């Protein structure tokens, strides 16, 4: 019934199995991939014809984690998987980025890749396995895909590279580096790094590329036995049309790209495009003309040629800079004084308002992942409204790009955050991109660093970021610092680097062509280091160290530790005690299972009142010490006094006064404030108090005074 083909290899100390022919046989390509006991199914399907009017490549990648893969049932009312989680969105992008450039130029048929996690062993992360399986499925599908790609995760543990570390090993790693590439070249890098050098990171990229070769060979071997016939697709030869268009508007495009202001340049480019389509496009007046959509694609090629040759031939870029110069930078802090921390970061025509908000443990984000549930106390949200590029457009929930850019900035900043013990706040950063002309994610990194310092977050060191680009031709190449949006779109590489004065914290690279050598990457990292240092210097002019304390409008938080066996007493039956503490003092109290108590409020007096109350419950009263107390009940043999938080003790009638007291009610009333000394505890553990040895006016210990008089 099944024609099963299987390829098994040992990879990084684990067994990788790629299988096809048993599941999802109606898909163009389907691969069941297993590593350890993690199982992923990847399918690839493509349309056999192009939709009329299609002028872009409609590739969709959907990565989905089924909760049954970890033996769980979804939370929520409906008990089924809903909208993609942040991780699913990020892994979908991770798979998309290295495979998109490998489809044959001009192919615009719809392609959908679906990667489904069927089983998770809680050791081997399914993201790398999903990338490998997606690559294999595309190679089997017959689509015009110039793969395969391989992928690998690299850690840095105890000074050594670790291939595809387990989730437990990643906790000890100083680097989380994901690399994808073909047999000949690296195509994509994504990482989070704890201030390592450029040499170590680049070494990790090369190590990953070497180690993924075995996977690439395995996919090729599987495809030789199971791939479908290649889809017949021949890119159309448009050289003749391109030559006509160049003669017609080549000079106009060159003139347009000498205009430094973005909006004016776009108007000039748009006018040249309109002129080309009017002259060469199909119309009633020109029945032998060409499809306007085809002309638009050719016009874009001409744009790229003009920009690229201009940079390589003259060393000057669209806005007149040389390849290493960073655009003018201005950093400002405290621009929104009632927020907890704020910054405006402007670099050329790219600008971000970043606001930091500090919260308590109640504000942490609860995340239900396959690996288990946890709370995240550092949040970064990136928003890219259409007005930032002078356009109208959709507003609403964030798209994949916004989620991806926000996560990149999050990874760059997280290694520099203080520990929870040193700074027990939840931190939320919101980056509003108000202008964009390239590298808005790196503007978010810089603005976020300033906003957190303005909020009093004790960062280990400030973080700056820069986006690099590349123009690569047969006769030479140029590495570009601080790229514009056009240089990103028309160039060969988008290379984002973030870090401190001591090392890198994040690196993201997307390469659109083959042929990027380690030497080129090394030059790009070295040039980026210079750019980062310059940007950091400009940021330091606005603020070079965190404020000494959080702002007036931020909540104040103090942390204390209590014995774990006292937690129940602080909470009380059904939460009665802790609710009373919160209601009476106005402070928020958060108690962890390990006895760490976080108390927060808008002012310090409320925090002190709550902490004193908690300590009165958890601390032991000290024999011989004098306390303020309140009479809570008067009886024939004395009075019960509340003197230490929730603790009550008995003042026996003989201990009320040095004079004889016949009836305690003649001397004491309920609610009366008194001063008492703790004498000790009786055989049953009951507390014994005394009023007569304490001066009720001054609180002086009279017994010590009498003892001193006797000695004299």
Swiss-Prot record:
SUPFAM superfamilies named in the record: Eukaryotic type KH-domain (KH-domain type I) (SSF54791), Nucleic acid-binding proteins (SSF50249), Polynucleotide phosphorylase/guanosine pentaphosphate synthase (PNPase/GPSI), domain 3 (SSF46915), Ribonuclease PH domain 2-like (SSF55666), Ribosomal protein S5 domain 2-like (SSF54211)
Enzyme class: transferase
Reaction equation(s) it catalyzes: RNA(n+1) + phosphate = RNA(n) + a ribonucleoside 5'-diphosphate
InterPro entries documented for this protein: ExoRNase_PH_dom1, ExoRNase_PH_dom2, ExoRNase_PH_dom2_sf, KH_dom, KH_dom_type_1, KH_dom_type_1_sf, NA-bd_OB-fold, PNPase
CC per GO annotation: cytosol
EC number from the UniProt entry: 2.7.7.8
Domain KH: from-to ranges: 555-614
Pfam families: KH_1, PNPase, RNase_PH, RNase_PH_C, S1
GO MF annotation list: 3'-5'-RNA exonuclease activity; magnesium ion binding; polyribonucleotide nucleotidyltransferase activity; RNA binding
Obligatory cofactor(s): Mg(2+)
Function comment: Involved in mRNA degradation. Catalyzes the phosphorolysis of single-stranded polyribonucleotides processively in the 3'- to 5'-direction.
PANTHER family: POLYRIBONUCLEOTIDE NUCLEOTIDYLTRANSFERASE, POLYRIBONUCLEOTIDE NUCLEOTIDYLTRANSFERASE 1, MITOCHONDRIAL
Protein name: Polyribonucleotide nucleotidyltransferase
Native organism: Caulobacter vibrioides (strain ATCC 19089 / CIP 103742 / CB 15)
Name of encoding gene: pnp
């Amino acid at each position: 019934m099944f024609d099963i083909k299987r390829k098994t290899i040992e990879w990084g100390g684990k067994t990788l199995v790629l299988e096809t022919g048993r599941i999802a046989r109606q898909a163009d390509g389907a691969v069941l991939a297993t590593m350890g006991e993690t199982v992923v199914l990847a399918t690839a399907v493509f349309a056999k014809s192009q939709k009329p009017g299609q002028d872009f490549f409609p590739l969709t990648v959907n990565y989905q984690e089924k909760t049954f893969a970890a033996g769980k049932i979804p939370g929520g009312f409906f008990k089924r998987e809903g909208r993609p989680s942040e991780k699913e969105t990020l892994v979908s992008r991770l798979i998309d980025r290295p495979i998109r450039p490998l489809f044959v130029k001009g192919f615009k048929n719809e392609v959908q890749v679906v990667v489904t996690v069927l089983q998770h062993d809680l050791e081997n992360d399914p993201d790398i396995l999903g990338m490998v399986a997606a690559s294999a499925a595309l190679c089997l599908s017959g689509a015009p895909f110039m793969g395969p790609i391989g992928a690998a995760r690299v850690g840095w543990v105890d000074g050594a590279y670790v291939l595809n570390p387990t989730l437990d090993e990643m906790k000890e790693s100083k680097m989380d580096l994901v690399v994808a590439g073909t047999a000949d070249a690296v195509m994509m890098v994504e990482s989070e790094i704890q201030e390592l050098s450029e040499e170590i990171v680049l070494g990790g990229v090369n190590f990953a590329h070497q180690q993924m070769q075995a996977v690439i060979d395995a996919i090729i071997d599987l495809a030789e036995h199971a791939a479908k016939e290649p889809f017949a697709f021949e890119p159309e030869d448009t050289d003749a049309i391109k030559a006509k268009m160049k003669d017609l508007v080549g000079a106009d495009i060159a003139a347009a790209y000498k205009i430094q202001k973005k909006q004016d340049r776009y108007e000039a480019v748009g006018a040249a495009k309109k002129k080309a389509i009017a002259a060469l496009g199909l119309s009633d007046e020109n029945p032998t003309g060409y499809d306007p959509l085809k002309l638009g694609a050719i016009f874009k090629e001409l744009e790229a040629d003009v920009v690229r040759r201009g940079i390589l031939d003259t060393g000057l870029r669209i806005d007149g800079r040389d390849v290493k110069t960073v655009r003018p930078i201005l950093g400002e802090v405290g621009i929104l004084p009632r927020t907890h921390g704020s910054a405006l970061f402007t670099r050329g025509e790219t600008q971000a308002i970043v606001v930091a908000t500090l919260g308590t443990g109640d504000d942490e984000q609860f995340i239900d992942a396959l690996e288990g549930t946890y709370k995240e106390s550092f949040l970064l949200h990136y928003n890219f409204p259409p007005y930032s590029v002078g356009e109208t457009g959709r507003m609403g929930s964030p798209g994949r790009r916004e989620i991806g850019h926000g996560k990149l900035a999050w990874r760059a900043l997280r290694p520099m955050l203080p520990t929870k013990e040193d700074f027990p706040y939840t931190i939320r950063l919101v980056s509003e991109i108000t202008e964009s002309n390239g590298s808005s994610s790196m503007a978010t990194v810089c603005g976020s660093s300033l906003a957190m310092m303005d909020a009093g977050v004790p960062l280990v060191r400030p973080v700056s970021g820069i986006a690099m680009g590349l123009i690569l031709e047969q006769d030479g190449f140029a590495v570009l610092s601080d790229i514009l949006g056009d240089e990103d779109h028309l160039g060969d590489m988008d290379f984002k680097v973030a870090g401190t004065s001591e090392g890198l914290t994040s690196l993201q690279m997307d390469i659109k062509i083959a042929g990027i050598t380690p030497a080129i990457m090394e030059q790009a990292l070295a040039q980026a280091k210079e750019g980062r240092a310059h940007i950091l210097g400009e940021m330091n002019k606005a603020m070079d160290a965190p404020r000494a304390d959080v702002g007036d409008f931020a909540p104040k938080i103090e942390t204390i530790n209590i014995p774990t066996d006292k937690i129940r007493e602080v909470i009380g039956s059904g939460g009665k005690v802790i609710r009373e503490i919160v209601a009476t003092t106005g402070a928020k109290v958060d108690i962890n299972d390990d006895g760490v108590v976080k108390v927060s409020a808008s002012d310090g007096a409320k925090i002190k009142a709550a902490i004193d109350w908690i300590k009165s419950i958890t601390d032991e009263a000290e024999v011989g010490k004098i306390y303020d107390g309140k009479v809570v009940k008067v009886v024939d043999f004395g009075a019960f006094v509340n003197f230490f938080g929730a603790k009550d003790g008995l003042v026996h009638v003989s201990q009320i006064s040095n004079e004889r007291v016949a009836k305690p009610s003649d001397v004491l009333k309920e609610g009366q404030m008194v001063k008492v000394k703790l004498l000790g505890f009786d055989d049953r553990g009951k507390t014994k108090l005394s009023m007569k040895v304490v001066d009720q006016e001054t609180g002086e210990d009279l017994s010590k005074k009498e003892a001193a008089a006797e000695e004299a």
